[in-house]
Curated annotation (Swiss-Prot):
Involved in membrane protein trafficking at the base of the ciliary organelle. Mediates recruitment onto plasma membrane of the BBSome complex which would constitute a coat complex required for sorting of specific membrane proteins to the primary cilia. Together with BBS1, is necessary for correct trafficking of PKD1 to primary cilia. Together with the BBSome complex and LTZL1, controls SMO ciliary trafficking and contributes to the sonic hedgehog (SHH) pathway regulation. May regulate cilia assembly and disassembly and subsequent ciliary signaling events such as the Wnt signaling cascade. The gene is Arl6. Gene3D superfamilies: P-loop containing nucleotide triphosphate hydrolases (3.40.50.300). A lipid is attached at residue 2 (N-myristoyl glycine). This is ADP-ribosylation factor-like protein 6. CDD domains: Arl6. Interacts with SEC61B, ARL6IP1, ARL6IP2, ARL6IP3, ARL6IP4 ARL6IP5 and ARL6IP6. Interacts (GTP-bound form) with the BBSome a complex that contains BBS1, BBS2, BBS4, BBS5, BBS7, BBS8/TTC8, BBS9 and BBIP10. Interacts (GTP-free form) with IFT27. GO terms for molecular function: GTP binding; GTPase activity; metal ion binding; NAD+-protein mono-ADP-ribosyltransferase activity; phospholipid binding.
C-alpha cells in the first residue's frame, strides 16, 4: 500500500492534508459536528464531552482534514494556544441557543484572534452557529452581531447555521473552508 500512496502522491492524486483546530465553548457541539463529517461507517454512536483534545480525520472531495477537537471546558481552554502554530484553519462552534454564554464565547474568540500565533496570519475561520433546531436559538446573523464578526477584517471567515445532530449546514461550511484552504495553497 505504501507504493500506491507514493505513486498517487507523485501523480498529484493524493489529497492534501490540512490541520484544522475545532474550538468553542463546552457543549457547543464541536465533537458532534466533527463526528457527523466522518463517513457514516466511522461515526461514533455515543458522543461524550472531550477531555483535553482528540484528533479526528475526515476527507472532502480534494482535502484530507486532520481535526484537533479541543475541549471547550474552562479548565482546558488554555491548551488551545499550544496548537495555534500548526493550525491551517479554524472551526469555531457556537451554541446559538445559549445566549447567556455568548459573552464568554466572544471573549474566547477575542483571545484567539489576538494571540501572536494567530493575529498576523490570514487563517480562514469557519463559524458554525450550531443548535439552530432548538426553540431558543438565535439566527446566524444575530450570532454574527453578538460576536462582532464583521470586525474581523484580516482573515477570511464565514458563518453557517447548523444542526449537528441532523448534519444540516455542515457541508456548506466544509465546502467554504475547502475553497479557502485551496486558495491559500495555490
Amino acid at each position: 500500500m505504501g507504493l500506491l500512496d507514493r505513486l498517487s502522491g507523485l501523480l498529484g492524486l493524493k489529497k492534501k492534508e490540512v490541520h484544522v483546530l475545532c474550538l468553542g465553548l463546552d457543549n457547543s457541539g464541536k465533537t458532534t459536528i466533527i463526528n457527523k463529517l466522518k463517513p457514516s461507517n466511522a461515526q461514533s454512536q455515543d458522543i461524550v464531552p472531550t477531555i483535553g483534545f482528540s484528533i479526528e480525520k475526515f476527507k472532502s472531495s480534494s482535502l484530507s482534514f486532520t481535526v484537533f477537537d479541543m475541549s471547550g471546558q474552562g479548565r482546558y481552554r488554555n491548551l488551545w494556544e499550544h496548537y495555534y502554530k500548526d493550525g491551517q484553519a479554524i472551526i469555531f462552534v457556537i451554541d446559538s441557543s445559549d445566549k447567556l454564554r455568548m459573552v464568554v464565547a466572544k471573549e474566547e474568540l477575542d483571545t484567539l484572534l489576538n494571540h501572536p500565533d494567530i493575529k498576523h496570519r490570514r487563517i480562514p475561520i469557519l463559524f458554525f452557529a450550531n443548535k439552530m433546531d432548538l426553540r431558543d436559538s438565535v439566527t446566524s446573523v444575530k450570532v454574527s452581531q453578538l460576536l462582532c464578526l464583521e470586525s474581523i477584517k484580516d482573515k477570511p471567515w464565514h458563518i453557517c447555521a447548523s444542526d449537528a445532530i441532523k448534519g444540516e449546514g455542515l457541508q456548506e461550511g466544509v465546502d467554504w473552508l475547502q475553497d479557502q484552504i485551496q486558495a491559500v495553497k495555490t
